[in-house]
């Protein structure tokens, strides 16, 4: 009988060891899925606990905080853009005027007594620059006509 009890105790000990091994293996494999399930449940709980009113209120508070900042940034951006646009127009005008001056010097190397007008840079539109080009060309034509009349005499 002692022998049977001893075998029973040994079998029970082996069974407990096997059960402990199974528990450690199942704990390791389910640990990841448990963390995932807990995270999903927490996310679900957050949405269940927060009422729609609280969400709308938080959204409005956020808009009240961020809207003025966005308006400031938008106005700064508009000012910078306006400044860059003026600078571009000025550079374009300077380029056009220098191009006209260069063309004037190339076409009239003989004329020393006629000086070109001083370049005054002001804010102008594309149409004004076109008008200026036309006037410069007209001036050049008139100077050539004057030269021709002087040569005829």
Swiss-Prot record:
It is found in: Nucleus; Cytoplasm, Cytoskeleton, Spindle; Chromosome, Centromere, Kinetochore. The lineage of its organism: Eukaryota, Fungi, Dikarya, Ascomycota, Saccharomycotina. This is DASH complex subunit SPC19. Its main location: nucleus. The keyword Cytoplasm applies. Component of the DASH complex consisting of ASK1, DAD1, DAD2, DAD3, DAD4, DAM1, DUO1, HSK3, SPC19 and SPC34, with a stoichiometry of one copy of each subunit per complex. Multiple DASH complexes oligomerize to form a ring that encircles spindle microtubules and organizes the rod-like NDC80 complexes of the outer kinetochore. DASH complex oligomerization strengthens microtubule attachments. On cytoplasmic microtubules, DASH complexes appear to form patches instead of rings. One of its GO terms (biological process) is cell division. Signal peptide: none annotated. The gene is SPC19. Component of the DASH complex that connects microtubules with kinetochores and couples microtubule depolymerisation to chromosome movement; it is involved in retrieving kinetochores to the spindle poles before their re-orientation on the spindle in early mitosis and allows microtubule depolymerization to pull chromosomes apart and resist detachment during anaphase. Keywords: Cell cycle, Cell division, Centromere, Chromosome, Chromosome partition, Coiled coil, Cytoplasm, Cytoskeleton, Kinetochore, Microtubule, Mitosis, Nucleus.
């Amino acid at each position: 009988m002692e022998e049977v009890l001893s075998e029973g105790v040994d079998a029970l000990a082996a069974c407990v060891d096997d059960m402990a091994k199974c528990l450690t293996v199942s704990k390791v494999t389910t640990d990841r899925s448990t963390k995932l399930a807990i995270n999903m449940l927490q996310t679900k709980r957050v949405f269940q606990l927060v009422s729609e009113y609280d969400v709308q209120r938080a959204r409005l508070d956020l808009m009240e905080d961020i809207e003025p900042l966005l308006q400031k940034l938008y106005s700064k951006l508009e000012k910078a853009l306006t400044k860059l646009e003026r600078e571009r127009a000025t550079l374009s005008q300077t380029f056009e005027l220098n191009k006209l001056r260069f063309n004037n010097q190339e076409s009239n190397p003989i004329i020393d007594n006629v000086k070109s007008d001083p370049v005054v840079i002001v804010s102008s539109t594309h149409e004004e620059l076109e008008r200026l080009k036309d006037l410069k060309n007209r001036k050049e034509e008139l100077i050539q006509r004057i030269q021709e009349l002087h040569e005829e005499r």
